[in-house]
UniProtKB/Swiss-Prot annotation:
Example GO BP: red, far-red light phototransduction
PANTHER family: OS08G0260000 PROTEIN, PHYTOCHROME 1
Species name: Selaginella martensii
Histidine kinase domain span: 901-1121
Keyword tags: Chromophore, Photoreceptor protein, Receptor, Repeat, Sensory transduction, Transcription, Transcription regulation
PROSITE patterns reported for this sequence: HIS_KIN (PS50109), PAC (PS50113), PAS (PS50112), PHYTOCHROME_1 (PS00245), PHYTOCHROME_2 (PS50046)
Function: Regulatory photoreceptor which exists in two forms that are reversibly interconvertible by light: the Pr form that absorbs maximally in the red region of the spectrum and the Pfr form that absorbs maximally in the far-red region. Photoconversion of Pr to Pfr induces an array of morphogenic responses, whereas reconversion of Pfr to Pr cancels the induction of those responses. Pfr controls the expression of a number of nuclear genes including those encoding the small subunit of ribulose-bisphosphate carboxylase, chlorophyll A/B binding protein, protochlorophyllide reductase, rRNA, etc.
Domain called GAF: residue spans: 219-401
Residue intervals of the PAC domain: 690-746
Keyword Repeat listed: yes
Record Pfam families: GAF, HATPase_c, HisKA, PAS, PAS_2, PHY
Family stated for the protein in its record: Belongs to the phytochrome family.
Protein's recorded name: Phytochrome 1
Length: 1134
C-alpha cells in the first residue's frame, strides 16, 4: 500500500494510517472474493498473482461486498470442535444460541428425547436456563456476569451437572448477551481444581515476566528474542515467531525459535494482505487466538430465530478458522497454532476506525507472537498466562518507545543545531556543497537542490533533466502544496516514474521558493530486505500458487519492487524545519544580507533564552526555599549545598550547620550511606533514580527520634554548559507510616488490631486473597477512596475494584492495570515491592496519587495466602515537591527549544507586518491614519507579549513579572475596540464605547499590554455569547482619584463590559474562577485573564442582571503627568 502525503505535519499521520487501513480492507475483501470464486469454479488459487491483481486492477468493490466480508469474518457461525459454545441472555441466562456439539460435550440427552419425570431439564434447547446445566459451581458464572470486566475472572471452572466433567468457561459480552466458550479441562490441569481465574493462571508466567523485566533497555531485538523463547518454554509449541507490522501495514518476522528440523522464517517479509485488517481488528478484541486442529471440521451454531443477525464471534476463543487460513497452515505443515497480539500505546491513533482496521483509542497492534505445532495441540489454562505475558511485553515495548522518543528528541535538537550551522554558510548552496549536508538530515540514497534553474546533486539521484521534469510536474499538479512525500513516484502519479528504474522510487520534495525545491530520494525496498529462510527452486512452478510463507515473500517482493521504505514522521519534521527556515530566510532576500540577518536572529534567540533560564533559576530557588517538602542538594563531591527549611525542621539540623557537611558520611545512617553514594554516582552519569528510601540522622530537638525516613527522587543539577555539577533530592517524609508498617509486617498474631485501627498514623491498607478477591479494606482506605469496606470485600481486586472501565477505583489506562497486576503477582510469589507509584480516581472523581508497597500474606505454616498493599499518600508536600522537580533545567531547556521554533515560525510574518507599519509611518498620514497605525503597533506588541507566555504556571502561581511603563488610556481603549470590531460586525452587533475625553488623554503607569489583553479577551467573550438579535455590546470606563501619602495620585479604574441576552454559560464562568470540573480553551483564556488582573492588584466579577450581564473589572494605577519638556513624572498633590 503506497503512502503519498502533500504535507509534512506528523499530526496528519493518524489520518494517513486510517486511510491506508481502509484501502487495505477493500483489498482484503477483493482477495477473499477471488479465493471464494476459485473454490466455486474449481480453479486453483494463485496467491501471488491474485495479490498483484488486486493491487493493479482499477475495479472497485461495492461497499455492501466489503460489509458482507467483514460480517463473515466476525459472524461466520462456526466454532472449533475441541470445545462448545453457549450464548445466553444477560441476567436470565436463557440460552439464545449453542454450538451443535454442546449437548454431547455436556453429556446431555439428545434434543429429540423428551424430558421425563420431575420436569428437571436435561436437554439443551433455545430457552434453556444455562445454570441448570452445571453443578452448584455455576454460581461462579452468575458472579462473573455481574462484573464490569469479565477478563479478570476468566477462565471460570465449572462442572457438567450430568457427568461432573470439568470445563473452563471463558465468558465475554456481545451485543445480545453473554458468550460462554466451554473447553474441557485436561487431566494435567486437574491439579488447578476450582482455583481458576486470571490471577492463578498468571503465576505460570512469573518466570518469563521476571526475565522480561530484567532485560537491559534499548534493544527491541533482544526483547523479541526473549519473548519467543519464554513463550516456547511456557507453551511447548514447535515453532514460535514474533511478527512486526511496519508503517505500510506489511509484516516482518523479527524473532524466531523452532524445532531444528523445521524450516526457518526469520527475516521473512509478507504483504499486508497476509493478515487482513479484519483479522487485526479481531486481535484487538481477542488478544489470544488458538487453533487446535486446522483440519478438523468446524461445528455449526444453532441460534434463536428471533435474533436479527448471526451471533458475533469476534471475542470467542472457539471461533473456527476461515478456509483460506486453514489452507495456508496446511501448506506450511502446521496443524495447530496459538497467536497472541502485541499491543502498545499510540497517541496518534484515532478512536474507532473504518473498515476492519478500527482500533482502540490510543492503542495499536504492533505485531503478533505466532506459535505453530505439527500435531493437534491446545493450551486452555496457559492462554491467560500468555495474554498477561503479552501485556507485560507491551509495557516493555512502550518503555522502549519512550527511550526511542528521547533519542528522537535528541536527534531533533542535533538537527536544529545542524540546520542553524548550515545557515551560517553560503546559503542556500552551503547545505549541499559542504559537510554536513542535507543527506545527513534523513536516511536517503540521494539528494538534490534545484535553485535558480541550477542543480546540485548528491548520491543516487535522477538526472538534471529528470529533476527539472519532476519540479515542473510538482508545480503543475501540486501547485497548492509546499511539498510532497511518497514511497512510490509511480503510485503518486508521476508520468516519468518508469524511466527512473529501481534506483529512484521514493521521494520527499520541499518547496523553498516559488519555483525552487529540495529533494531527497530513496531506492526500492527490496534491496533492504534480507531473508534467512530457505531458498526455493526458481523452476518450482507451484511455488507462487500456494498460500505459503515463501509465496507471501515472493508476493511482497513483487509489491515493493517499485517502492521505497516509507518516510517516517520524525524525518519529515526535520525536512519541514529546514524548509521553514529556508523559506523564511532566503525568499526575496539579497545574499549579501543573509549572514548579518541570521547572526542577528540567533543572537536575539540566545539572549532571550538566557533571560528565561535566569528567570526559571530564580523561581526555582524561591520554590525550594519555601517548599513544604524536604529538599536537600549536594555538589559533585557529595557535600551539602542546599538544605531547605522543611528538612531542617524534621531533622533538627539548622541550614547553617548543614552546609558543607558530607551527606553520606555525616548526615545519614550507616545503612543509607551506600545508597547515597550510588545515587550520587548515577546522577553524575545523568541517570536519575526515583522513590529511593533514605534514613537521615536527627539532631537538637528531634534527637529523640531514631531517624527521619525520606522517600526521595534524585535530580541532576546542571550548569549552563549542560555539565552535571550536583544532585538535588526532593523527598517525602514517611517516618510515621514506615514505623507503623514495620510493626505490622513483623506481627505474628492477629493483625486486625492494627489494620482496623482508626489512628491517623495507620496508612491506607487493602489486600487480596490467593484468588485475587479483596479480603481487606481498612478505615484509612475507606477515607481515601470514598468506598466502604462492605462495598468492596469479596470483589475482584483487579477487574472489579481497580480497572479502566466503570470501576470503584478507576485507573488511568491499560498500562497502569498491567503494572499493578505485576506488583500483585510478584507479592503473591513472595517478592515484595516497595514504593511503587500508584494512582487512581476516588469515588468523587478526584485523582489520588500514592506510593504502594505490596507484601505477601502468609499463614502460620508460612504458606502464602494472599497479598497486602500499603499506600504512602502522595500528600500536598509530595505534590509541591514534584512541581519543583518538574521546574528544573530540563523544563528550561525544553522551553528554549519550543520558543526558538515557535518564534521562528510565527515572528516571521509578524516582522513583515512590523516592516509594513514602519513604511507607513514614514509617509504623510492624517491624524486618523496615525491613530490606526498606533493601534496596530500596540496590537503587535500584545502578540509579542503573548508569544512569550510559554509558562502559564507563572501566571497561575502569581509570580509573573509585570512591565511598568507610562501609557495613554486612549491608546489602550483603541486597541481593545479594534480587536472586537470584526467579530461584532460579523454578528451585526453595534459596539458602544463610553470613554470620556479626559480619560482618553489620561497618562498612567502600568502594564499596558496586559491591560489591553485582558480587556480584549473579556470583550470578545461578551460578543461571542451575545445573540445577533440583541444588536449591541458596550464597554464603559469610569474613574475616581485617590491620593497616596500626599505625593502620588492613584486612579481607580472601573471597566464595565456589558452585553444583553442570557450571558456566558455558567460552566464557563465557573472555569474562569477555577471552579469548573474541566477546562475548555475559552475557560483557560478567561482564567488566565482573571489571574493577570489579580497580578495587577485588581478584581474581576461577572454579574447577571435582568436582561443584561457584564464583566466588572476594577483596578488601580498610578497617574502620570507630562511636563512641558515631554518628560514624565508621578502627579503630586497641589
Amino acid at each position: 500500500m503506497s503512502t503519498t502525503k502533500l504535507t509534512y505535519s506528523s499530526g496528519s499521520s493518524a489520518k494517513s494510517k486510517h486511510s491506508v487501513r481502509v484501502a487495505q480492507t477493500t483489498a482484503d475483501a477483493k482477495l477473499h472474493a477471488v479465493y471464494e470464486e476459485s473454490g466455486e469454479s474449481g480453479d486453483s488459487f494463485d496467491y501471488s498473482k491474485s495479490i498483484n491483481a488486486t493491487k493493479s486492477t482499477g475495479e472497485t468493490i461495492p461497499a455492501q461486498a466489503v460489509t458482507a466480508y467483514l460480517q463473515r469474518m466476525q459472524r461466520g457461525g462456526l466454532v472449533q470442535p475441541f470445545g462448545c459454545m453457549l450464548a445466553v441472555e444477560e441476567g436470565s441466562f436463557r440460552v439464545i444460541a449453542f454450538s451443535d456439539n454442546a449437548g454431547e460435550m455436556l453429556d446431555l440427552m439428545p434434543q429429540s428425547v423428551p424430558s421425563l419425570g420431575s420436569g428437571q431439564q436435561d436437554v439443551l434447547t433455545i430457552g434453556t436456563d444455562a445454570r441448570t446445566l452445571f453443578t452448584a459451581a455455576a454460581s461462579a458464572l452468575e458472579k462473573a456476569a455481574g462484573a464490569v470486566d469479565l477478563s479478570m475472572l476468566n477462565p471460570i471452572w465449572v462442572q457438567s451437572k450430568t457427568s461432573a466433567k470439568p470445563f473452563y468457561a471463558i465468558v465475554h459480552r456481545i451485543d445480545v448477551g453473554l458468550v460462554m466458550d466451554l473447553e474441557p479441562v485436561k487431566a494435567s490441569d486437574t491439579r488447578v481444581g476450582s482455583a481458576a481465574g486470571a490471577l492463578q493462571s498468571h503465576k505460570l508466567a512469573a518466570k518469563a515476566i521476571s526475565r522480561l523485566q530484567s532485560l537491559p533497555g534499548g534493544d527491541i531485538g533482544l526483547l523479541c528474542d526473549t519473548v519467543v523463547e519464554e513463550v516456547r518454554d511456557v507453551t511447548g509449541y514447535d515453532l514460535v515467531m514474533a511478527y512486526k507490522f511496519h508503517e505500510d501495514e506489511h509484516g516482518e518476522v523479527v524473532a524466531e525459535i523452532r524445532r531444528s528440523d523445521l524450516e526457518p522464517y526469520l527475516g521473512l517479509h509478507y504483504p499486508a494482505t497476509d493478515i487482513p485488517q479484519a483479522s487485526r481488528f479481531l486481535f484487538m478484541k481477542n488478544r489470544v487466538r488458538m487453533i487446535c486442529d486446522c483440519s478438523a471440521p468446524p461445528v455449526k451454531i444453532t441460534q434463536d430465530k428471533e435474533l436479527r443477525q448471526p451471533i458475533s464471534l469476534a471475542g470467542s476463543t472457539l471461533r473456527a478458522p476461515h478456509g483460506c487460513h486453514a489452507q495456508y497452515m496446511g501448506n506450511m505443515g502446521s496443524v495447530a497454532s496459538l497467536v497472541m497480539a502485541m499491543i502498545i500505546n499510540d497517541n496518534d491513533e484515532p478512536s474507532g476506525g473504518g473498515g476492519g482496521g478500527g482500533q482502540h483509542k490510543g492503542r495499536r497492534l504492533w505485531g503478533l507472537v505466532v506459535c505453530h505445532h505439527t500435531s493437534p495441540r491446545s493450551v486452555p489454562f496457559l492462554r491467560s498466562a500468555c495474554e498477561f505475558l503479552m501485556q507485560v511485553f507491551g509495557l516493555q515495548l512502550n518503555m522502549e518507545a519512550a527511550v526511542a522518543a528521547h533519542v528522537r528528541e535528541k536527534h531533533i535538537l542535533r538537527t536544529q543545531t545542524l540546520l542553524c550551522d548550515m545557515l551560517l554558510r553560503d546559503a542556500p548552496i552551503g547545505i549541499v556543497s559542504q559537510s554536513p549536508n542535507i543527506m545527513d538530515l534523513v536516511k536517503c540514497d540521494g539528494a538534490a537542490l534545484y535553485y535558480g534553474k541550477r542543480f546540485w546533486l548528491l548520491g543516487i539521484t535522477p538526472s538534471e533533466a529528470q529533476i527539472k521534469d519532476i519540479a515542473e510536474w510538482l508545480l503543475e499538479h501540486h501547485k497548492d502544496s509546499t511539498g510532497l512525500s511518497t514511497d512510490s513516484l509511480a503510485d503518486a502519479g508521476y508520468p516519468g516514474a518508469a524511466s527512473l528504474g529501481d534506483e529512484v522510487c521514493g521521494m520527499a520534495a520541499a518547496k523553498i521558493t516559488a519555483k525552487d525545491f529540495l529533494f531527497w530520494f530513496r531506492s526500492h525496498t527490496a534491496k533492504e530486505v534480507k531473508w534467512g529462510g530457505a531458498k526455493h527452486d526458481p523452476d518450482d512452478k507451484d511455488d507462487g500458487r500456494k498460500m505459503h510463507p515463501r509465496s507471501s515473500f515472493k508476493a511482497f517482493l513483487e509489491v515493493v519492487k517499485r517502492r521505497s521504505l516509507p518516510w517516517e514522521d520524525v524525518e519529515m519534521d526535520a525536512i519541514h524545519s529546514l524548509q521553514l527556515i529556508l523559506r523564511g530566510s532566503f525568499q526575496d532576500i539579497d545574499d549579501s544580507d543573509t549572514k548579518t540577518m541570521i547572526h542577528a536572529r540567533l543572537n536575539d534567540l540566545k539572549l532571550q533564552g538566557m533571560d528565561e533560564l535566569s528567570t526559571v533559576a530564580n523561581e526555582m530557588v524561591r520554590l525550594i526555599e519555601t517548599a513544604t517538602a524536604p529538599i536537600l542538594a549536594v555538589d559533585s563531591s557529595g557535600f551539602i549545598n542546599g538544605w531547605n527549611a522543611k528538612v531542617a525542621d524534621v531533622t533538627g539540623l539548622p541550614v547553617t550547620e548543614a552546609m558543607g557537611r558530607s551527606l553520606a558520611k555525616e548526615l545519614v545512617l550507616h545503612e543509607s550511606a551506600d545508597m547515597v553514594e550510588r545515587l550520587l554516582y548515577l546522577a553524575l552519569q545523568g541517570d536519575e533514580e526515583q522513590n529511593v528510601e533514605l534514613k537521615l540522622k536527627t539532631f537538637g530537638g528531634q534527637k529523640d527520634k531514631e531517624a527521619v525516613i525520606l522517600v526521595v527522587n534524585a535530580c541532576a543539577s546542571r550548569d549552563v554548559s549542560d555539565n552535571v555539577v550536583g544532585v538535588c533530592f526532593v523527598g517525602q517524609d514517611v517516618t510515621g507510616q514506615k514505623v507503623v508498617m514495620d510493626k505490622f509486617t513483623r506481627i505474628q498474631g492477629d493483625y486486625k488490631a492494627i489494620v482496623q485501627n482508626p489512628n491517623p498514623l495507620i496508612p491506607p491498607i487493602f489486600g487480596a486473597d490467593e484468588f485475587g478477591y479483596c479480603s481487606e479494606w481498612n478505615p484509612a482506605m475507606e477515607k481515601l477512596s470514598g468506598w466502604r469496606r462492605e462495598e468492596v470485600l469479596g470483589k475482584m481486586l483487579v477487574g472489579e475494584i481497580f480497572g479502566i472501565q466503570m470501576m470503584y477505583c478507576r485507573l488511568k489506562g491499560q498500562d497502569a492495570v498491567t503494572k499493578f497486576m505485576i506488583v500483585l503477582n510478584s507479592a503473591a510469589d513472595g517478592q515484595d515491592t516497595e514504593k511503587f507509584p500508584f494512582a487512581f480516581f476516588d469515588r468523587q472523581g478526584k485523582y489520588v496519587e500514592a506510593l504502594l508497597t505490596a507484601t505477601k500474606r502468609a499463614d502460620a505454616e508460612g504458606s502464602i495466602t494472599g497479598v497486602f498493599c500499603f499506600l504512602h499518600i502522595a500528600s500536598a508536600e509530595l505534590q509541591q515537591a514534584l512541581t519543583v522537580q518538574r521546574a528544573t533545567e530540563k523544563v528550561a531547556l525544553s522551553k528554549l527549544k519550543e520558543l526558538a521554533y515557535i518564534r521562528q515560525e510565527i515572528k516571521n510574518p509578524l516582522y513583515g507586518i512590523m516592516f509594513t507599519r514602519t513604511l507607513m509611518e514614514t509617509t504623510d498620514l492624517s491624524e486618523d491614519q496615525k491613530q490606526y497605525v498606533e493601534t496596530g503597533a500596540v496590537c503587535e506588541k500584545q502578540i509579542r507579549k503573548i508569544l512569550d507566555d510559554m509558562d502559564l504556571e507563572s501566571i497561575e502561581d502569581g509570580y509573573l513579572e509585570l512591565d511598568t511603563t507610562e501609557f495613554m488610556m486612549g491608546t489602550v481603549m483603541d486597541a481593545v475596540i479594534s480587536q472586537g470590531m470584526i467579530t461584532s460586525k460579523e454578528k451585526n452587533l453595534q459596539l458602544i464605547r463610553e470613554t470620556p475625553k479626559e480619560i482618553k488623554a489620561m497618562f498612567l503607569y502600568g502594564d499596558q499590554v496586559r491591560l489591553q489583553q485582558v480587556l480584549a479577551d473579556f470583550l470578545l467573550n461578551a460578543i461571542r455569547f451575545t445573540p445577533s438579535s440583541e444588536n449591541w455590546v458596550g464597554i464603559k470606563v469610569a474613574t475616581s482619584r485617590k491620593r497616596l501619602g500626599g505625593v502620588v495620585h492613584v486612579m481607580h479604574l472601573e471597566f464595565r463590559i456589558t452585553h444583553p441576552g442570557v450571558g456566558l454559560p455558567e460552566e464557563l464562568v465557573q472555569e474562569m474562577f477555577d471552579r469548573g470540573r474541566g477546562m475548555t480553551q475559552e475557560g483557560l483564556g478567561l482564567s488566565m485573564c482573571r489571574k493577570l488582573v489579580k497580578l495587577m492588584n485588581g478584581e474581576v466579577e461577572y454579574i447577571r442582571e435582568a436582561g443584561k450581564n457584564y464583566f466588572l473589572v476594577s483596578l488601580e494605577l498610578p497617574l502620570a503627568q507630562r511636563d512641558d519638556a515631554g518628560s514624565v513624572k508621578f502627579q503630586a498633590s497641589s
